[in-house]
Amino acid sequence: MEKKVYADYHGPRCTREHDEKLGQWKYYGIAQKSKVQNREVNYNADCIKENGLFDLATRSYPLLGMQSQRDEDYIEFQILTAKLAHIDGFFVEWGFQEHESNEELLIMMRIAKKLGFEIGINWCDAWHFYSWIEEFHKDAVSREKKLELFENNVQYLIDVLFQTEVGAKIDGHPLIFLFGGGLNIEEFIKIKEKQYQLPRGMKEPYFFARAPIVGKEEKNDVAYELEENEWTKVTDGIFGWIPTRVRDGLATEKFSSWDRYATKEDAEKYVDALYKAMDITESKLHISCVNPEMDNRACASWNKYDLSYISRESGETYESMWKKNLEHKEDADIIYIISWNDYTECHQIEPTLKDGYRELETTRRYASKWKGQKNTGASSDFLLPMRLFYLRKKVRRLNKAGLDVLEYQALLDGIADRIRNRKISEAQLFLEGIERLLQNVEKQIIERKFLLLQKQGRIRTTEGRIILYLEELKEHMTHGGYDSWLSFSYLDETNKSFEFWHKNCKICEIKMENTQCWKQIKIPIFQENIKGLEKELVIKISGEVQIKDVSYFVCTYHVWNE
């Protein structure tokens, strides 16, 4: 059987520009079961900090900054980058077909089809039994009705995902991971035994449960073992997850920011225990794992649990888990990377400002060894999808400025295809060529910059409103494209939130911290969020807040016409 490397894909993450919302880039919470001193977090992702970066819910800033996981340009970047690292597919953390995770799944499938990539499901089955689903199914108040919908969602995945060429399957069996916390044993048995309508050639789905590996610390040493339960008997096997953290963080000064932690050596022992567990449970597939780090402070443990930690150790933790898997090379069918992009728990391998492409380089090197393939390519190859992404954005900006860009888009599609097929030299040449071409095209664009100040009378604040008197600026803003930012100070005197709206579109949401100080912030106001621009741009304020010192900076751009 062909060995596979898959990566967990976390979400949702959105942007005001693309989606009119932020998803999990914004987060406020308290780690309810934590005993550490600092267990509260507040990330206002609409705000641009003094260093020019958005205040994102992460402790490791993405290399490409805040992007939308519904943006096809961004998904193309992610998939092409993953393919260069010998990753075969993403397993989307999914809830049900009406849940917003399904939007990401459908968009991901479209791009995956173009790029020859697989998509699987890590089913967050607990989401299915929250009240969320009742918003879409008013009669789903009983557990029985929710179970009926669960069966419908299995059939939905078969029909929509797994019968396509991108659906992750092994020997004709769709792969579904169950994260746990939703179904009980009896309910799952009924789900698994149901006769689903399968297309010709497809076999029944394989369901894998998260491995119940438990640890115990004695005399500064940790031992792991399988905690046998009924799940290991009724599913088709288990899959590895983040190594269990059992050391007492509060007992040490170094790890006092967390309740629990694990070391690099613990992670290695976890892998050994996982392989033993897969043998004991007679898993139909052996699905091991690698994990670079764990730090759930950015999400305050999802406002529920305690805080735990595994140090990245400058990439050594991730590499050591890969080495352990190489020792068991003949005993595994799949390596599951946890994760591609979970920034809130800081176990992403997607490139960041802090770590660059280091974890992807590690993945490329060890995944090829584990698969028995030649490790082709160079570290510089990873830059190609990023360069393509920025060219995509440049072309979209030229289009907003008034240029016909169909020809350029076709050229970029060709570059994506070359990267997909590892025609690196050709992709490099075409990238250099179109970069030079677009530099010349940009010379046709005229930029104008404007600054409106409250103290000059161009901005007025009234109760519940900020009024920007655009006057002659309106013509420039409607003639082509523009970028704009609003700066202001607010009195941080409560723990409540306030919001800015333009008509029916939310521009920002700020959660205050009751510091009793004036805070100065800067937020972008995207052209996509301003509908029906008039000479007076009225921003409605929702919530009680004092505002002062408002300024509005605009950079307009359009095609130069003689």
PLM segments and residue spans:
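Glycan-processing catalytic domains of CAZymes
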Residues: M1-R448, I525-E528
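Glycan-recognition and processing domains
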Residues: I446-G480, F553-E562
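Intrinsic-disorder/low-complexity, polar/charged segments enriched in Ser/Thr/Lys/Arg/Asp/Glu/Gln
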Residues: R465, D483-S487, W518-K522
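Solvent-exposed strand-to-loop "edge" motifs in beta-rich extracellular domains
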Residues: G481, S487-T494, F526-E528
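Short, surface-exposed beta-strand/strand-loop-strand elements in extracellular ectodomains
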Residues: K496-K506
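Extracellular carbohydrate recognition and processing domains
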Residues: C505-L533
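Extracellular beta-strand elements of beta-rich domains used
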Residues: I523, L537, V550-Y557
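Short beta-strand-plus-loop segments that form exposed binding edges in beta-rich domains
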Residues: L537-V545
